[in-house]
Amino acid sequence: MNVIEKISVVMCTYNGEKYIRQQLDSILQQTYPIHEIIINDDISTDKTVDIIKEYMIRHDNIHLFVNSKRLGAHPNFMVALEKASGNYIAISDQDDIWELTKIEKQIACIKGYTLCFSLSRAFG
C-alpha cells in the first residue's frame, strides 16, 4: 500500500514579487500532493504579501505569516520551520522554480531511510 506522506513546504520571503508567482505555481503543480505551504515574510516592502494573499484565496493549503520585525534570512527560516506539521519538510527560496516531479522523486528516493538530506545547486 502506498502511503501519501504529509509534505510541508517552507518558504521565506522578502521583496520577492519578481519570482514569487512562478515559484508558487511550480509548488502547486507538483505531481505529489503538498499538505501545506508555510510562508514567512520578513516585512516585504513590495507586493510580495499581496501576491501571496491572492494565491491564498484559491489555495487553502497556503499559510502566510508576516514577522512583526525584520529577522533576516536565517532566523526567518528558523521561525518558519517551527510552523511546519508535515512528515517531510521541503525548504524553498522565493525565487526557486521547481521541476514538476521534484517532491515525487525525493519521496521515492528517501522512503525507508530514517535520515535523509537533499542538496540542490543553482544554475544559469
Q: Could you tell me what each predicted segment is?
A:
Residues 1-124:
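Nucleotide-sugar donor-binding/catalytic module of glycosyltransferases
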